From Swiss-Prot:
Keywords: Cell inner membrane, Cell membrane, Membrane, Transmembrane, Transmembrane helix
Database matches in Gene3D superfamilies: Fumarate reductase/succinate dehydrogenase, transmembrane subunit
Protein name, UniProt field: Fumarate reductase subunit C
Chain's role: Two distinct, membrane-bound, FAD-containing enzymes are responsible for the catalysis of fumarate and succinate interconversion; fumarate reductase is used in anaerobic growth, and succinate dehydrogenase is used in aerobic growth. Anchors the catalytic components of the fumarate reductase complex to the cell inner membrane, binds quinones.
Gene: frdC
Amino acid sequence: MTTKRKPYVRPMTSTWWKKLPFYRFYMLREGTAVPAVWFSIELIFGLFALKNGPDAWAGFVDFLQNPVIVIINLITLAAALLHTKTWFELAPKAANIIVKDEKMGPEPIIKSLWAVTVVATIVILFVALYW
């Protein structure tokens, strides 16, 4: 049996996300995927350049020294830091940690995640620069 009734479909404009600051920040956070894709492609090209010998690697390093690429990489770094910040703020909401019959607040978890990130960054930089 078919019906002639038309269901109500609420109109949705293409600018729905511009109405509230929460939605704008949501779109910004989701947009951090684009710089992540850029960095992934750049890293893959770097690996292929490393595999193809010193001349290819020198060309890749020259490419990285282009001022436009430096600016794009700084934007990518900012996007990665924003994504990391929002992810670390989300992590305590997913973990229900109880210490001495009280639920632990989000601050210790967020601070420990940042501490691990800083330590890992320092170790990686030390190995890359001085090993």
